[in-house]
């Protein structure tokens, strides 16, 4: 890895006061950005500059800054989470850019993710889908079976863990030409469909989650595969196929 250096960049950033107001791209110039800094640290630096200039800082989502929570959600130069692969926005570093580059930064674009302010969008649609069926029933009467005593085939356990890696960032929706949430819902359905603990609500779970997904206004899946490519956790399209099978079985019962 080459030594860190400072670069000067131009930024085209979407600014919007709220969901009901019109937004536009605004231009900013930022100098002396270390290539060792993260993308969000670069935005912090820009906001410090704006505050010193007595201007409104840019609103953007972030929390853990470790690629775990799924809060950071920026469309950078036409790609969800930016030009690198297998990472979230907070894991993107400025060494991916060159001196003099112009960087375009936009919020997630989806009817189901309305803009709250600037680069922050409302992703509570995902929460409502999860609440519709993303859970398992647990006996709390005192006769609970130890989870470790329930055998799970190794292959099923591995696939369940892979599905559970979904952090709900919404990159799949943002990058999909149809604004589909099938990869997210497929991962959540698969996570429980593969485990014996998830069999209790299996039928109602997939029906409820798919119905809620449709009510939220997400688009249909046309198997383009962009969601899998841009997913920072590498969630496989196999989960969509599994959800479709679960939905068909549940619909026929």
Label each residue range with its predicted role.
Residues 6-28:
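Eukaryote-biased recognition of intrinsically disordered, low-complexity regulatory segments
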Residues 26-38:
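Short, contiguous acidic and Ser/Thr-rich linear segments
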Residues 76-100, 105:
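Glycine-rich phosphate/adenylate-binding loop and adjacent beta-alpha elements
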Residues 37-56, 104-253:
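Ferredoxin-type iron-sulfur electron-transfer modules in oxidoreductases and energy-metabolism complexes
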Residues 1-4:
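N-terminal mitochondrial targeting presequence
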Residues 14, 30-31, 76-78:
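Short strand-turn-strand beta-turns centered on an Asx-Gly dipeptide
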Residues 59-71:
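Short, structured protein-protein interaction patches enriched in aromatics and acidic/basic residues
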């Amino acid at each position: 890895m080459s030594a860190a250096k400072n670069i000067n960049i131009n930024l085209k950033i979407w600014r919007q006061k709220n969901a009901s107001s019109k937004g536009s791209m605004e231009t900013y110039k930022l100098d002396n950005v270390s290539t060792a800094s993260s993308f969000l640290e670069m935005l912090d630096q820009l906001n410090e500059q704006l505050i010193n200039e007595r201007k409104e800082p840019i609103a953007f989502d972030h929390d853990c800054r470790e690629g775990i929570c799924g809060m950071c959600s920026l469309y950078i130069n036409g790609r969800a989470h930016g030009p690198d692969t297998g990472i979230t926005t907070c894991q993107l570093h400025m060494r991916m850019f060159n001196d003099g580059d112009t960087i375009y930064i936009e919020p997630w674009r989806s009817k189901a993710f309305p803009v709250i302010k600037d680069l922050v969008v409302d992703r509570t649609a995902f929460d409502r889908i999860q609440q519709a069926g993303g859970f398992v029933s647990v006996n709390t009467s005192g006769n609970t079976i130890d989870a470790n005593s329930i055998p799970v085939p190794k292959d099923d356990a591995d696939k369940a863990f892979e599905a559970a890696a979904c952090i709900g960032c919404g990159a799949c929706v943002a990058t999909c030409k149809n604004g589909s949430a099938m990869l997210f819902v497929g991962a959540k359905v698969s996570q429980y469909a593969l485990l014996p603990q998830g069999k209790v609500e299996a039928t109602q779970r997939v029906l409820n989650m798919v119905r809620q997904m449709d009510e939220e206004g997400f688009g249909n899946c046309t198997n383009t595969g962009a969601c899998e490519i841009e997913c920072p956790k590498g969630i496989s399209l196999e989960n969509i196929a599994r959800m479709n099978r679960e939905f068909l079985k549940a619909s026929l019962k």
